[in-house]
From Swiss-Prot:
It comes from Sus scrofa. Its EC number is 1.1.1.44. This is 6-phosphogluconate dehydrogenase, decarboxylating. Belongs to the 6-phosphogluconate dehydrogenase family. It is an enzyme of class 1 (oxidoreductase). Keywords: Acetylation, Cytoplasm, Gluconate utilization, NADP, Oxidoreductase, Pentose shunt. InterPro entries: 6-PGluconate_DH-like_C_sf, 6PGD_dom2, 6PGDH_C, 6PGdom_BS, Pgluconate_DH. One of its GO terms (biological process) is D-gluconate metabolic process. GO terms for molecular function: NADP binding; phosphogluconate dehydrogenase (decarboxylating) activity. The gene is PGD. NADP(+) binds at S245, S246, S247, Y248. Substrate binds at K29, R56, R214, H220. Catalyzes the oxidative decarboxylation of 6-phosphogluconate to ribulose 5-phosphate and CO(2), with concomitant reduction of NADP to NADPH. GO terms for cellular component: cytosol.
Length: 250
């Protein structure tokens, strides 16, 4: 965020801002890709980093996008008529909430890796980015405080500080995302962060339909809510045999 502010203000030798002169095709060295691959391997929804990587991939299709911009229609350009100062605050809060989600997901991945490799403590990992790193952040002090309060904390969003922070940002977050969608502005990280938050806070998700579909086309079985650990197969079409399993790993 600090360097972004500096970049936005930076002027070229001709007195004009430099940023609009830079080709909008982002490169990458692989750290984001490695993180996304690790998240998939460990089954952890690190969606923000994944979307950030894919957004760079999309940006690299510059020539295709130039052609697509001439053929694909979106919403008509809308002149913003609201309170700009108020909306800037909405964007600030949307950014803050999304940042919380990003760190939440990162520590979910670290937690899973710690379980896999038998790490006894991740305290050092919570502090290692505070300086000397491209993502150095004072924000990590709040994360350390959360785990100091509750060493067994399952998720940052369940800590009182972060829970209150996200709740305070929520209305602004939704307004910013909604405005972007209505005006056709791509916001992959804001939208996936909000989608993760809404998914995480729901007791029930439509994944039961996914399990039913998997059982329908592949007889993968599904677990019944009324019988935890009991997996069954349904003969959805009236044809074929039946399958049941108590040990299938869905």
């Amino acid at each position: 965020i600090e360097i972004t502010a500096n970049i936005l203000k930076f002027q070229d030798a001709d007195g004009k801002h430099l940023l609009p002169k830079i080709r909008d095709s982002a490169g990458q060295k692989g750290t984001g890709k490695w993180t996304a691959i690790s998240a998939l391997e460990y089954g952890v929804p690190v969606t923000l980093i994944g979307e950030a990587v894919f957004a760079r991939c999309l940006s690299s299709l510059k020539d295709e996008r130039v052609q697509a911009s001439k053929k694909l229609k979106g919403p008509q350009k809308i002149q913003f008529s609201g309170d700009k100062k108020s909306f800037l605050e909405d964007i600030r809060k949307a950014l803050y909430a999304s940042k919380i989600i990003s760190y939440t997901q990162g520590f979910m991945l670290l937690r899973q890796a710690a379980a896999e490799f038998g790490w006894s403590s991740t305290t050092e990992h919570r502090l290692m980015w505070r300086g000397g790193c491209i993502i150095r952040s004072v924000f990590l002090g709040k994360i350390k405080d959360a785990f100091d309060r509750n060493p067994g904390l399952q998720n940052l969003l369940l800590d009182d500080f972060f829970k209150s922070a996200v709740e305070d940002c929520q209305d602004s977050w939704r307004r910013a995302v909604s405005t972007g969608v209505q005006t056709g502005i791509p916001m992959p990280c804001f939208t996936t962060a909000l989608s993760f938050y809404d998914g995480y806070r729901h007791e029930m998700l439509p994944a039961n339909l996914i399990q039913a579909q998997r059982d329908y086309f592949g007889a993968h079985t599904y677990e019944l809510l009324a019988k935890p650990g009991h997996f069954v197969h349904t003969n959805w079409t009236g044809h074929g045999g039946s399958v049941s399993s108590s040990s299938y790993n869905a």
